[in-house]
Amino acid sequence: MSLNFTGFSEDTLDFQQFLREENWSKDSWDENSKEIWRKNVKPEINSLLSVCASDISERTEFNFQSDIARGWNRGGPTKFFWGAVVPQNGHRHTNIQLFIALRSGYVRAGLFLEDSIKAKAAWDFAINSMKNNEQQVSNVIEQASIIGINPCIPLLPKQKGTPIPTKIDPKSNLWSTTFENHKQIDILKAWKVGDPILRNPNFANEIISVFMELMPLYRIISNPEVFD
């Protein structure tokens, strides 16, 4: 896996929009699509993830690795392309994700965890930790929002990648309750695919900055045993 990220290509940035126009049909995953995935999308996401995993492993007390999702499944191409930085020997479906996602119209990056069967242990630990550290969690989220990193509402599979920030639960005024209601934690920054920075190798630094801004929250909600 290359540690050299040279920026996203036009083929990569345009690919999800094309698939969206084709309604992600099985027929749209033809030989040309497979070649774009193999030669552009997959290696570019992989290289960006590996740069980020290496960098934040050096900057923090954690050891990270990259983990990329497939671009297709039995139903056809996936509604977005994504991968994540996860604990060494971890998995994107069971651990907190420091993720990168190419979703129609946007590149998104941030911290994600879902209340799912596979991630149940990580989810329960994260929510309980939030409840015990509500003020610290609120401080991190408030600070991150200054540079455009915000908690967002869940999206349906076919929705565009437009980030829709969420507000804290008005009754409890607690972020833990907000995320419990959403059944996921999704705190992110997004760039429109037309943004020139996406085509620049320095975009890796943008992603690393997002991950490091969220690292105080990661420390609060991650179970240290997953790094043992």
Segments the model singles out, each with a brief description of its role:
Residues 1-31, 35, 39-56, 154-228:
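Long, solvent-exposed, polar/charged low-complexity segments
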Residues 89-131, 180-197:
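Intrinsically disordered, low-complexity regulatory segments enriched in Ser/Thr/Pro
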Residues 105-170:
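Compact, glycine/acidic-enriched structural inserts
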Residues 16, 67, 134:
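Functionally constrained cores in energy, signaling, and assembly domains
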